[in-house]
Amino acid sequence: MGPDLDFRPLKSFLTQHALSYQSANVAVTYVAALPAIQGERPRVIGYISLTCSEVDLGGMYALEDCQHANRYPSMPALKIARLACHSDYRGRRVGEALVDLAIALAADHIGPTVGCRFLVTDSKARSVSFYERAGFTLLETEENQARAEPVMFLDLNKLDLDPANDPALPAQTADGTPD
């Protein structure tokens, strides 16, 4: 989105393919948009497309809380298939908010309903640090490190999803009212 050549395929996906992928139950796309001004359409400033997936951790990551599952070659995951932010809004936490949405969907809805241990993505090389800041880990296999778009994963069971522990939220009393 915006003039960056690396992101042109991401922009064309949103305008040309996202709806058909969603209609065919291949991927669901969520957009971040600014409200419409003076009768114009809302302005899309970012989007994320999610799909069901699995991740082969190559024996490099063991589940400590479910050792028996370690015998399986892959684990259930939700995949960030596409993530894009308009160039005018990079650095303004739009991408972070969209990744947070994916985490919330995986942890609060998908995981408890059908089982989903990981959030995964095939990261563009220049986006690896973005995903690392979001808590993702680069899969440490030689094959993965040689890929143009290496696999990164986030173990949803390792997250502290208790809102009471979020320093960005105001403290609350036991009855839920602000402190």
List PLM regions with ranges.
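Non-catalytic substrate-recognition and accessory regions of acyl/acetyltransferase enzymes
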Residues: 1-92, 96-124, 128-179
